[in-house]
């Protein structure tokens, strides 16, 4: 069924026309309990969604849309191990990685909880040895640096988490990440580490990913130029992979290969052995606490009524703006410097999941799907793109994320940060009218002629929606909950848009073409196999390598 032709969708189209002229400033003035009506408190987290262009009827219609999309059945099917990733014939069970032990679940004859428990125990034993100093390098020194080599979900998740939880690391081990095929990335990391005390974690499910394998071979060559003996590789390299043969060929001891499964997608994999670098940096107990936080959000998502369900509410608000206001963009603004990698992580989670143009039946969709996700930490973002948020021609919904406790209580820093966060959401909601701008200019002693010239530039339309997420603090548990919340938000939107949120065919074409172009770059023959633009670019590169400048 095309949900855009459903009764709920039609009702929302009509309702949008009803609320179009309503201003949130007036909604707050007419309802002093608006915050109470549109906020949820849960387990150390507060979601305030009262600063949205909604009323109780809006939310009722959006929840009905979710019901007509069979959201509850889809959610239950995912947790039960149904193969909802139908284009790859796979279950979607990242949630099983953090479930409480003692449940029963089989997928293709595999005992899922037993498999997960086995890998967690392997991770704990390995982590305890490395962190405790029992694991020694080839000269007998303990490990002081871990270099994670991966890309996409094998990089973005662990990198974001280790940055977010840096205050919880004891400093015994530093962690570094290499992802980009640009040789600068691996070169700069290798400058900062010592072969005698560095452990490389190669994160690649197939152990064939071009970027990861190229970077890994460079790291291997760098290591052997110092350690000499290939037998030493086993002391300094571990793998997160399913390809035992390739891992052994590389020189890695299979005892130090950590497996995961095809029912764990890359962008949902930080909870698996892909999170090994997290455990090595923070300790295994912190990694388990991250899992517990995610599990708590899983249970909330499964058990809370749709009307009080945090991921569902966030997803429905996104659908409201994306599909009924034609707003294809959503900003994420963490007011915490440790969360500076969260927007990049959410870009992949959301855009790779729901950036789809065909529905589950293979039909081209007739409505917008995944939005553009972007953002920067506050207050940096205020001095970069908030001009557009406040006075641009359209509006962009935004999530403001703020921990109430700072890990670095210095002077008034945190109070100023908090004041800015709250002020921005109020300003985006309220705006400033022409009369208010005129009064402000008059109070500043501006003459009438100048005032008439300036007033239009001083007007803020307001009525620009935001969600505010307050957390007691960012710690492993709350971060786990926050990440799982966004995972489930993306899932809900995928169900409503009727797309497969768990494949990513869109990354394949460019990779295929790159394989064809690579030998052409290294050939002596001028390229003529492509369109005029691509041929010219290839030949420009070849000419440059032969000594000719581009321009």
Swiss-Prot record:
Belongs to the GPI family. Keywords: Cytoplasm, Gluconeogenesis, Glycolysis, Isomerase. GO terms for cellular component: cytosol. The active site is at 352 (proton donor), 383, 511. The keyword Secreted does not apply. This is Glucose-6-phosphate isomerase. It comes from Chlorobium luteolum (strain DSM 273 / BCRC 81028 / 2530). It is found in: Cytoplasm. The lineage of its organism: Bacteria, Pseudomonadati, Chlorobiota, Chlorobiia, Chlorobiales. Pathway: Carbohydrate biosynthesis; gluconeogenesis; Carbohydrate degradation; glycolysis; D-glyceraldehyde 3-phosphate and glycerone phosphate from D-glucose: step 2/4. It comes from the Bacteria. One of its GO terms (molecular function) is carbohydrate derivative binding. Pfam families: PGI. Its main location: cytoplasm. Gene3D superfamilies: 1.10.1390.10, Glucose-6-phosphate isomerase like protein, domain 1 (3.40.50.10490). Catalyzes the reversible isomerization of glucose-6-phosphate to fructose-6-phosphate. GO terms for biological process: gluconeogenesis; glucose 6-phosphate metabolic process; glycolytic process. Its EC number is 5.3.1.9. It catalyses: alpha-D-glucose 6-phosphate = beta-D-fructose 6-phosphate. It is an enzyme of class 5 (isomerase).
